[in-house]
Curated annotation (Swiss-Prot):
Superkingdom of the source species: Bacteria
Matching NCBIfam families: 3a0106s01
Residues the record lists as binding ATP: G35, P36, S37, G38, C39, G40, K41, T42
Protein name: Sulfate/thiosulfate import ATP-binding protein CysA
Gene Ontology, cellular component aspect: ATP-binding cassette (ABC) transporter complex
Keywords from the named record: ATP-binding, Cell inner membrane, Cell membrane, Membrane, Nucleotide-binding, Sulfate transport, Translocase, Transport
Family under the similarity heading: Belongs to the ABC transporter superfamily. Sulfate/tungstate importer (TC 3.A.1.6) family.
Function: Part of the ABC transporter complex CysAWTP involved in sulfate/thiosulfate import. Responsible for energy coupling to the transport system.
Assembly description: The complex is composed of two ATP-binding proteins (CysA), two transmembrane proteins (CysT and CysW) and a solute-binding protein (CysP).
One Pfam family linked to the record: ABC_tran
Gene Ontology MF term list: ABC-type sulfate transporter activity; ABC-type thiosulfate transporter activity; ATP binding; ATP hydrolysis activity
Name of the gene this protein is made from: cysA
Catalytic activity: sulfate(out) + ATP + H2O = sulfate(in) + ADP + phosphate + H(+); thiosulfate(out) + ATP + H2O = thiosulfate(in) + ADP + phosphate + H(+)
Matching SUPFAM superfamilies: MOP-like, P-loop containing nucleoside triphosphate hydrolases
Length: 357
């Protein structure tokens, strides 16, 4: 089922929570709403579900206007951060619950319900826990059961509101991979709310980055990461260091270093800030003009990566090198490094003001 949102607005008193939201979610895709707390992502999810009413705009499911339809008529499945399993029911009965309370005309037979629950427990790899109760399960197992319960009624749309937020990092990572596989197998249109950049980048077909009730950028995980459209998206999608330079004659200049800008944009001569991610630095060759010359303050090797903190004037700059690259150079505290970037994301001062976090 495809989702189309047109000019959606929502106020809470004087607070404008959603501002003219326009969004298309293609059939069968897993789309993440990504942004900081208070950006409007959960409000948007609740309006799509029918749990909250919009002040203006439309919501279309497969081209049909459902803006005024009750949540029960939207055929939506939910998975929340807090599993909301029934403590007095075992795993089997929790998964079966949605089927047992359907109107009699729509309710499957007991045999069909049993077959469906067994199928779903096999899908989430927890068949052996059918007779267990929620308090006997780990957090990851409870969340798998919550997803199985949501899928039991065969929703046309699956909504997930920070489903892994209450779990520890290792379990979250395992469940992200598992969710991606489940979605690939079932193909149900899904919308995931998260503030976790890594989670969104790992599981999503498309990402919708939100801030202050607006959509900042929509695209594939790779496009969002590789081609951020503004300073907010650049900063929000991972660690960066910022350098204030100047645009002149199609180049961004900083400290004698020049970075050629994309010719398709008409860059005006102005002050502009360049953002560089830790892994997008490299050590300058002898014939290259470095962007910065900095003293190493700390070195920390983690597996195949070497994390380096350098001091550039009063600014701390974070560098991440592959272990093989770091081994070719005298990387040690107190040594100096000449560094050039492999990629610089440049934004004007006006953009920085408009998209400040």
């Amino acid at each position: 089922m495809s989702i189309t949102i047109q000019n959606l607005n929502k106020h809470f008193g004087n607070f404008h929570a959603l501002k003219n939201i326009n969004l298309n979610v293609p059939t069968g895709k897993l789309v993440s709403l990504l942004g900081p707390s208070g950006c409007g992502k959960t409000t948007l999810l609740r309006i799509i579900a029918g749990l909250e009413n919009a002040d203006g705009g439309k919501i279309l499911f497969d081209g049909q206007d459902v803006t005024a339809k009750h949540v029960r008529e939207r055929k939506v499945g939910f998975v929340f951060q807090h599993y909301a399993l029934f403590r007095h029911m075992n795993v089997f009965d929790n998964v079966a619950f949605g089927l047992t309370v359907l109107p009699k005309s729509e309710r499957p037979s007991k045999g069909q319900i049993r077959a469906k629950v067994e199928e779903l427990l096999k899908l989430v790899q927890l068949s052996h826990l059918a007779k267990s109760y929620p308090h006997q399960l780990s957090g990851g197992q409870r969340q798998r059961i919550a997803l199985a319960r949501a899928l039991a009624v065969e929703p046309k749309l699956l909504l997930l509101d920070e489903p892994f937020g209450a779990l520890d990092a290792k379990v979250r990572k395992e469940l992200r991979t598992w969710l991606r596989d489940i979605h690939h197998n079932l193909g149900v249109t899904s919308i995931l709310v998260t503030h976790d950049q890594e989670e969104a980048l790992e599981v999503s077909d498309e990402i919708v980055v939100m801030n202050h009730g607006k959509i900042e950028q929509t695209g594939s995980a790779e496009a969002i990461y590789r081609k951020p459209e503004n300073a907010f998206v650049t900063e929000f999608l991972g660690e960066t260091d910022a350098f204030e330079g100047r645009i002149e004659k199609g180049f961004w200049h900083y400290n004698g270093f020049a970075w050629k800008l994309d010719a398709q944009y008409k860059w005006q001569e102005q002050t502009a800030t360049g953002y560089i991610r830790p892994h997008e630095w490299q050590i300058a060759a002898e014939h290259e003009t470095p962007m910065i010359c900095a003293e190493i303050e700390k070195v920390h090797a983690v597996g195949a990566l070497t994390h380096i903190l350098v001091k550039h004037g009063k600014q701390d700059v974070h560098i991440t090198l592959a272990g093989s690259d770091a081994a070719r150079y005298p990387i040690a505290e107190g040594k100096e490094l000449n560094l050039i970037p492999k990629q610089v994301y440049v934004f004007s001062q006006n953009e920085l003001i408009e998209y400040s976090i």
